[in-house]
Swiss-Prot record:
This is Large ribosomal subunit protein bL35. GO terms for molecular function: structural constituent of ribosome. It holds the Pfam family Ribosomal_L35p. It comes from Methylobacterium nodulans (strain LMG 21967 / CNCM I-2342 / ORS 2060). It comes from the Bacteria. The lineage of its organism: Bacteria, Pseudomonadati, Pseudomonadota, Alphaproteobacteria, Hyphomicrobiales.
Length: 66
């Protein structure tokens, strides 16, 4: 049986930590930020951990090696 390939869309969007948590970048920073406060924009920086239920789905369906 051939190796399982990771879905390339998931590869670009998610990262799995050493402890098995799934990290993702928060949405809402592409355009229209003139309406947001500086604090809101600052809080969207960096990465966030995905909730456990969603993380399980991501690992199961999109990242076969994760």
């Amino acid at each position: 049986m051939p190796k399982l390939k990771t879905k390339s869309g998931a590869k670009k969007r998610f990262k799995i930590t050493g402890t098995g948590k799934v990290l993702y970048a928060q949405a809402g920073k592409r355009h229209g930020m003139i309406k947001r406060t500086t604090k809101q924009i600052r809080n969207l920086r960096g990465t966030t951990t995905l909730f456990e239920g969603d993380a399980a789905n991501v690992k199961k369906f999109f990242l076969p090696n994760g």
